[in-house]
Amino acid sequence: MRVTSNNMMNSYLKDVQKNLQGMNKINNQISTGNQVNKVSDDPLKAVKIMNLNNEISDIERYNSNVDEVNGWLDMTDNALDKVGTLSSEIKTLLTSISGTFGKDEMKAVSSEVNEKIKQIGEAFNTSYGGKYIFGGSITDEPPVKVNVDENDGTVSLVFRNTNDEGKPNKGLSDNLNVSVSNGINFNYNLNINEVSNSGDAFDIFEEVSDALKGDTAD
């Protein structure tokens, strides 16, 4: 077979192109530190690498979720501790009332109790990362409305979102879930319906406040 100069040139160019591609591949491996930079380099290895990258991405997401949940739970514990402490302080104030108390002393106790009820409402409206932790799935607005009577300073707590019966709307009672591992979801919140015992706590605070108001009336 006769080899023409044209054939030789084409063969030469193919060899040069092949060598350049090989050099470019090696250069990419050196600069990126990766043996496989695209699927065509090594399809089998490329698939394995993509699978590993997906697993790494999932693990990073799970770790981020766990960190978020831990912060949320810490904030929940702090808020509930505050509610518990304030409730105990209200009980102490009430048990300190003596039959010999005059109106001024009763007004002082009433003022302290109402201030603590207000602080309990603020604790129920605790937020973490811009989300209200006791709001169920309604995380963008406080779950509790703190009403203060302008005349006598009496404080009452009510659900911000209620139905016709005065009960919290479904969103306030929702649970929040997050994925912490493959196939494992974790419910990480307490909603206001749970922590207020379906609003019974609000009723008790209101009864206490009203009773003190009656004892301090002129």
Segments (PLM) and residue ranges:
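Amphipathic alpha-helical polymerization modules
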Residues: 1-140, 213-218
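Polar, low-complexity export/assembly segments characteristic of proteins
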Residues: 16, 23, 27-30, 34, ...
